[in-house]
Amino acid sequence: MANNHYFDLGLDGARHTIQLLDELGVQHIGAGNNIKEASTPVIKVIHDKKVAFLAFCYKEHTGWCPWATETEPGINPMYDDYVVSEIRKYKKQYDYVVVISHWGKEHTGFT
């Protein structure tokens, strides 16, 4: 969910997506109705190991896909200090931390 298309259908569409996923019992990461929801990992037990899945999205601040705040919906922000602190926090609690990141400049080739 942490990607630049989260708000393609506007604020109502983003909220509706979260509502439907929750109603259907589909776990999701990287976006939510506030930063607490957007930053909450999905936890799975795999071969007796607890694994935390986190998702972050880098973006240039254009305003079209805002980062979540304490009171506003959005995506889980991807900036160095924050990502490192989140990984460290969850490494203390779980056997593994898997980070899914969405970043890069749109419409550019790989170099």
What does each model-identified segment do?
Residues 2-111:
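Acidic, metal/ion-coordinating pockets
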